[in-house]
């Protein structure tokens, strides 16, 4: 097992592509590309709208990317994208930034013994290069890296709650698994739509061949329309920075920069031609999952519970038109996520020494 080092995401792009087969988060790959390609476009909005992230953004630029790649004769086994720290003794796994809910190494689909060997080789190389400690933000507690770290000197600083919805084939099985109260709320929303004579439509677009494509001027215009719903929901949090907040969420955030793009999707619920709810994010084909860092509802249609209907419509559509069987709603354990059949899981803020234990 050999370990190579690259000083940019672009330089390691081939290896990064090779190591997405074992369920590694699609967010990591897609957003890293957006960060490196469009950093200066992001910075003004990020620094002004999210002051607590400004230092992270600036340091991201000042600490260039470094990517370690473990490979054997069959190809890349593991990729470790880092932000190289200026003091040389501390690095964070790249992706610790606004709206990214998973941060981890990228693993190829290989036997566990090969992944273990690659992990130890990469950590040893980091230690040789003077990186004494490494940090993960939002590391999945039941993931591959977390299982390796159980035998490694490490500390968990904070735990975050996340929710994913796993559904069977067909909408009927999903609905039967919901609580009586959840089914009643969905039924009430549908009845209100019928009584009020509302026309409801659902659409799904992706760049991975599921649903309609995401290219073209029409799609870009549609994205501006549905993102305005998200902006309106966020503006109340940033009243003193209204224009900057709008520019950031429409154009400068990492989700905005990486969707549309490789591995991206958008699902939208419309009522009488207006956006009632939408979600956007990434398709993780290895996990057969949607990763959803951004979901928003239009308050104008609040009486119809558009967010709940969006999830139900998405489950029905995905069951019939794809092999996706998980909608990962990521960080946050809001009640509506659990009512819709969500399952709690944890991500952690972790620090570890790079020195390989005996």
Task: List the predicted regions and their residue ranges.
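Secondary-structure boundary/capping residues
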Residues: 48, 198, 327, 345-346
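Conserved catalytic-core motifs of GNAT/GCN5-like acyltransferases
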Residues: 157-165, 344-356
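Active-site donor-binding loop signature of nucleotide-sugar glycosyltransferases
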Residues: 8, 107, 165, 283, ...
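Flexible, glycine/proline-enriched loop segments at strand-loop-helix junctions
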Residues: 106-110, 173-178
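Acyl-donor binding region in acyl/amide transferases
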Residues: 85-158, 287-344
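A conserved beta-strand-loop-helix scaffold within acyl/acetyltransferase catalytic domains
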Residues: 3-92, 139-144, 148-157, 162, ...
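Short capping/connector residues at structural and topological boundaries
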Residues: 110, 180-183, 341, 349
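Short beta-strand-to-loop capping motifs
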Residues: 107-110, 165-168, 206
């Amino acid at each position: 097992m050999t370990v190579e080092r690259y000083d940019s995401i672009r330089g390691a792009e081939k290896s990064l592509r090779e190591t997405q087969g074992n369920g590694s988060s699609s967010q990591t790959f897609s957003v890293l590309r957006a960060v490196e390609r469009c950093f200066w476009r992001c910075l003004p909005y990020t620094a002004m709208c999210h002051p607590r992230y400004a230092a992270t953004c600036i340091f991201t630029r000042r600490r260039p990317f470094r990517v370690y790649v473990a490979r054997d004769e069959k190809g890349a086994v593991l990729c470790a994208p880092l932000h190289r720290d200026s003091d040389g003794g501390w690095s964070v796994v790249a992706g610790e930034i606004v709206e990214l809910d998973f941060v981890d190494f990228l693993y190829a689909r290989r036997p566990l013994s090969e992944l273990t060997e690659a992990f130890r080789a990469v950590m040893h190389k980091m230690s040789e290069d003077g990186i004494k400690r490494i940090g993960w933000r939002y590391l999945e507690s039941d993931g591959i890296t977390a299982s390796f770290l159980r035998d490694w000197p490490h500390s968990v600083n904070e735990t975050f709650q996340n929710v994913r919805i796993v559904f069977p084939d067909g909408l009927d099985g999903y609905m039967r698994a919901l609580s009586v109260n959840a089914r009643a709320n969905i039924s009430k929303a549908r009845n209100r739509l019928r009584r009020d004579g509302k026309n409801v439509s659902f659409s799904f677009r992706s760049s991975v061949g599921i649903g309609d494509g995401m290219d073209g001027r029409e799609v870009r215009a549609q994205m501006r329309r549905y993102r305005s719903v998200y902006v309106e929901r966020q503006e109340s949090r940033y009243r003193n920075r209204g224009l900057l907040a709008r520019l950031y969420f429409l154009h400068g955030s990492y989700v905005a920069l990486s969707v549309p793009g490789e591995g991206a999707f958008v699902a939208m619920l419309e009522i009488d031609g207006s956006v009632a709810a939408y979600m956007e994010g990434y398709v993780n084909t290895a996990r057969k999952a949607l990763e959803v860092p951004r979901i928003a509802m239009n308050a104008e249609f609040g009486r119809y519970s558009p967010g709940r209907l969006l999830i139900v419509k998405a489950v029905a559509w995905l069951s019939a038109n794809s092999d996706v069987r998980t909608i990962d709603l990521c960080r946050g354990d809001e009640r509506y996520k659990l009512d819709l059949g969500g399952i709690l899981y944890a991500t952690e803020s972790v620090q570890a020494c790079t020195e390989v234990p005996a």
